[in-house]
Amino acid sequence: MSPAPRVLVLVVATVVALQVSPAAGRIPGAYGGGEWQSAHATFYGGSDASGTMGGACGYGNLYSQGYGVNNAALSTALFNSGQSCGACFEIKCVNQPGWEWCHPGSPSILITATNFCPPNYALPSDNGGWCNPPRPHFDLAMPMFLHIAEYRAGIVPVSYRRVPCRKKGGVRFTINGFRYFNLVLITNVAGAGDIVRASVKGTSTGWMPMSRNWGQNWQSNSVLVGQALSFRVTGSDRRTSTSWNAAPAGWHFGQTFEGKNFRV
């Protein structure tokens, strides 16, 4: 009589395993596309988005960095003193009575936060001072705005939510500075997209915390020249990625190296 229960246990275990395996394969993260929130959106940068290059996140040429025209400047309420640089958002236009400038079907766009939209206290928040606190506002690259609304609208109500960033390749570390000052620009971050903590390790040092200088530029005042460098970064979803020996011992200032990215 004993073999029968063993067979039953095996069958049940197999069914349970099949049921949980898809969930087990998912990658944890805080931004799976949550509830929509309300904001407004305008545009800047010209039809080719060339005016969006540079910016308060430090990314420089958004084309070469892989961000392209899918970018936006965030108001104070969203920018979070630069900590939101690299975060990804899904945005869609919302028609309101007497204000119907959205494209049919209300298509959504995916953008990365790459710049800061400063407040203009000389103008009221509802008439020109669009980025004044506490307004959540997106100043979109012009091509992205035109994807969701008509040009003549100028400004439109939108719904937005945080979503995971999907990037090609690994996290990129661009090392600038000089012997006693290392300024590392962190770009192309998948997952949460925004980095809240960063550390560096040389071949002859332990892990050393880096401090945010501005945007996604992180600094260390240690002498690291001549050492292979490893980097450890943590996103706002509390996941951490370690890139061992991302930069070889012979690295030079101005070079960019690719490390391990977050899974999405």
UniProtKB/Swiss-Prot annotation:
Domain Expansin-like CBD: 180-259
GO-annotated biological processes: plant-type cell wall loosening
Protein's recorded name: Expansin-A7
Main location: secreted
Phylogenetic classification of the source organism: Eukaryota, Viridiplantae, Streptophyta, Embryophyta, Tracheophyta
Gene from which this protein is expressed: EXPA7
Source organism per UniProt: Oryza sativa subsp. japonica
Signal peptide positions on this chain: 1-25
Subcellular location: Secreted, Cell wall; Membrane
Tissue specificity field: Expressed in panicles.
Top-level lineage group: Eukaryota
Stretches assigned to the Expansin-like EG45 domain: 54-170
GO cellular component, one term: membrane
